[in-house]
Amino acid sequence: MNECPPGTRPFRVRHAAAELRQGGVVAYPTEAVWGLGCDPRNADAVARLLALKGRPERQGLILIAAESRQLARYLAPLPAEWAETIQASWPGPMTWVLPASTRAPRWVSGGRDTLAVRVTAHPVAAALCSAFGGALVSTSANPSARRPARSVAEVRRYFGTRIDALVPGRLGGLERPTPIRDGRSGAYLRR
């Protein structure tokens, strides 16, 4: 279980996790920008998150986790050589596009046979995944075509009371969103 980092009130993380379990959408800091998250198994929660952003389902979403076992249900078994490379990059700011399992919800994968996933090293995001007990949908906290939020004030300006909880904390220090790599080829899809 990931502990709450210093300066983060554990009750805020527990409250956000409770909101997630009830189908809520929450905001939290990540490696580079503020994120919006929800329970990936809850189609209504994902639809609400997508509506907040004005983002189509077909684009797919990223899942973050505190540890790789939280992602296992969503991913097809990986060849050993892939698993070694991927595991060596986690926890950390590397998102991988990997073959999805048949249990991966289409509303998260965008209807593709792959899924973008990351085991986060950000202490607040990891603590939230641990308190929730599983992986979360994670997307930048901004309406489509607007720049991602880099402060609590921007999150509030974009979404006001339309989100169910906000877990305070600092961003992880990256200037740009996490890189995304294709697990099959190793190619960078986003640097």
UniProtKB/Swiss-Prot annotation:
- Which Pfam family, giving just one, matches this sequence? Sua5_yciO_yrdC
Molecular function GO terms recorded: ATP binding; double-stranded RNA binding; L-threonylcarbamoyladenylate synthase; tRNA binding
Q: Which residue ranges traverse the bilayer?
A: none
Q: Where in the cell is it found?
A: Cytoplasm
Residues covered by the YrdC-like domain = 10-191
List keywords of the entry alphabetically. ATP-binding, Cytoplasm, Nucleotide-binding, Nucleotidyltransferase, Transferase, tRNA processing
Catalytic reaction list: L-threonine + hydrogencarbonate + ATP = L-threonylcarbamoyladenylate + diphosphate + H2O
Output the superkingdom of the source species: Bacteria
Q: What is its EC number?
A: 2.7.7.87
Q: Name one GO cellular component term.
A: cytoplasm
Q: Which InterPro entries match?
A: DHBP_synth_RibB-like_a/b_dom (IPR017945), Sua5-like_dom (IPR006070), TC-AMP_synthase (IPR023535), TC-AMP_synthase_SUA5 (IPR050156)
Q: Which GO terms describe its biological process?
A: regulation of translational fidelity; tRNA threonylcarbamoyladenosine modification
- Tell me which Gene3D superfamilies the record gives: DHBP synthase (3.90.870.10)
Name the principal localization, coarsely classed. cytoplasm
Q: Which PANTHER family match?
A: SUA5 (PTHR17490), THREONYLCARBAMOYL-AMP SYNTHASE (PTHR17490:SF18)
The record's function comment reads: Required for the formation of a threonylcarbamoyl group on adenosine at position 37 (t(6)A37) in tRNAs that read codons beginning with adenine. Catalyzes the conversion of L-threonine, HCO(3)(-)/CO(2) and ATP to give threonylcarbamoyl-AMP (TC-AMP) as the acyladenylate intermediate, with the release of diphosphate.
What is the similarity comment for this entry?
Answer: Belongs to the SUA5 family. TsaC subfamily.
Its name, as the record gives it, is: Threonylcarbamoyl-AMP synthase
What is the source species? Halorhodospira halophila (strain DSM 244 / SL1)
